[in-house]
Amino acid sequence: KGVNGIETCRSGFNGAGGINTYKSTSDGYYSLAGGGATDIRLIGGNWDNLQSLLSRIIVAGGGGGGSGNSHDSIGHGGGTKGKDGISIANKYFAGGGSQFQGGLTFNSLYNGSFGVSGAGDGISGVGGGGGWYCGAGSFYAEFGGGGSGYILTKDSYKPANYSPSSKYYFSDINSVVGGNTTKQDGYAKITLLQALPFLTISSYNST
């Protein structure tokens, strides 16, 4: 929450939409960047490197940012499509990302795209959530759109120049939107299904 009259600018983590220059007010308005995605990718580098984004095989979508005001729909992330962020009057909305495109809103400047969310701007502006395709941001949607999740399978959508091969395909998958059984957005939990063998560590001194 900004101090009255202070202009702030916040960037988002791993695809989340940041907040452009925003001037807080004595009314206590505040805006939040979107939540970042968590992903497993095969090629490293900067988070927004296109080649790296095109190597993602699992993505947990982040939730859209919130302005703290009333709303009809919270932009949870994850699942095959992120939830839309909708204001209480349904006058403004920020769409969630899907498997095929980023979230859309009334102004294309705030639309989400592949791996990059729409930014927020203005009073109560909000950023979209990071994801496979990211959510839209807005200057007054009260909640940004959530980013979509992704799991690579034989039948999953694969954009042009997508690099992982069939040896990385998953089966028997379940993609869940945040805010349901998980109660959270944009996180990954790794469970060890088989005990690792004991490791023998040897050391030596070179002369």
What are these regions (language model features)?
Residues 76-103, 109-118, 193-207:
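Terminal export signals
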